[in-house]
């Protein structure tokens, strides 16, 4: 049985572990426990063939910056996560996470994943952001960043309501099995 290795990265507390636990067990964890390193495996059927989807959770905290890349070798696809209600986690996608994974695994496809979409319309969350002159990240803003950073695509979900959750992993599997064709570059030739 073929295994697909999927590694999840992103800032601490954006919901990486909840995403994985909600997907693999259909239960939402009730308390926050910072992750050092965990992995989960699920069997998925693709075109009538069984695949093992190996899901590797990582710690977003800076203390683990030297340890985290040890989980990167042989990765088939990365999920680069940010919370749609945490502008700093969105900023770190381009400042930290994409540079980190492309440094270690330059040819590995990645998806940009917006988490906690159930909070996008939550009045107290919106109020907290407004106090700092911020607002939730829109899908359009995230899609533009995904294009700019050459992500396979942008997907978003809520681990709490499970909205969009299965789609995140379906898209990750597709990206791993059918990595996008490298764009042909045209050279400028002066005669």
From Swiss-Prot:
Topology relative to the membrane: Lipid-anchor
Entry keyword Hydrolase: yes
Residue numbers bearing the Cysteine methyl ester modification: 188
Regulation: Regulated by guanine nucleotide exchange factors (GEFs) which promote the exchange of bound GDP for free GTP, GTPase activating proteins (GAPs) which increase the GTP hydrolysis activity, and GDP dissociation inhibitors which inhibit the dissociation of the nucleotide from the GTPase.
InterPro entries: Cdc42, P-loop_NTPase, Small_GTP-bd, Small_GTPase, Small_GTPase_Rho
Motif range (Effector region): 32-40
Record field: catalytic activity: GTP + H2O = GDP + phosphate + H(+)
Gene3D superfamilies from the UniProt entry: P-loop containing nucleotide triphosphate hydrolases
Propiece residue ranges: 189-191
Lipidation (S-geranylgeranyl cysteine): 188
Database matches in SUPFAM superfamilies: P-loop containing nucleoside triphosphate hydrolases (SSF52540)
GO CC aspect terms: apical part of cell; cell projection; cell-cell junction; centrosome; cytoplasm; cytoplasmic ribonucleoprotein granule; cytosol; dendrite
Biological processes per GO annotation: actin cytoskeleton organization; actin filament organization; adherens junction organization; cardiac conduction system development; cardiac neural crest cell migration involved in outflow tract morphogenesis; cell junction assembly; cellular response to type II interferon; dendritic cell migration
Family: Belongs to the small GTPase superfamily. Rho family. CDC42 subfamily.
Protein name: Cell division control protein 42 homolog
């Amino acid at each position: 049985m073929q295994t697909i290795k999927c590694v999840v990265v992103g800032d601490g507390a954006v919901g990486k572990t909840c995403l994985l636990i909600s997907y693999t067990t259909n239960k939402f964890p009730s308390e926050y426990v910072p992750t050092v390193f965990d992995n989960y495996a699920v069997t998925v059927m693709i075109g009538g063939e069984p695949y093992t989807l190996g899901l590797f959770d990582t710690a977003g905290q800076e203390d683990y910056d030297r340890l985290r890349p040890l989980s990167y070798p042989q990765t088939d696809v990365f999920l680069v996560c940010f919370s749609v209600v945490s502008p700093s986690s969105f900023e770190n996608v381009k400042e930290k996470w994409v540079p980190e994974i492309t440094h270690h695994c330059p040819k590995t496809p990645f998806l940009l994943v917006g988490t906690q979409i159930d909070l996008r319309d939550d009045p107290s969350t919106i109020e907290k952001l407004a106090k700092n002159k911020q607002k939730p990240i829109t899908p359009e803003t995230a899609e533009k960043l995904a294009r700019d950073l050459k992500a396979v695509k942008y997907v978003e979900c809520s681990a709490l309501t499970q909205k969009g959750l299965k789609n995140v992993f379906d898209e990750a599997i597709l990206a791993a099995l059918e990595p996008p064709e490298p764009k042909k570059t045209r050279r400028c030739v002066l005669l």
